[in-house]
Amino acid sequence: MKRIATTNAPAALGPYAQAVDTGDTVYCSGQLGLDPATGALAEGVQAQTHQALKNLKAVLQEAGLTLDNVVKTTVFVQDLGDFGTVNEIYG
């Protein structure tokens, strides 16, 4: 098992990796809309969604993968009223 880490996404806050490569599968930890350079949360749901996806892409890139390789995700939305906005960006 290999731990995946990149400075192009926020560092893990606990004793876990940004991603783990098990040989056949890469498991990514959750990503927030945090700027990896400053640690600041992006302003608003649109900017947070874009930043979270940018962070995920950076972790995947470090593992030699892209979003095309992703087969499952779980998305948490604090306000269900933002679901349409998140889904539009995410889709």
Report residues per predicted region:
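Short, polar/acidic, helix-capping and beta-turn segments at strand->helix junctions
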Residues: 1-91
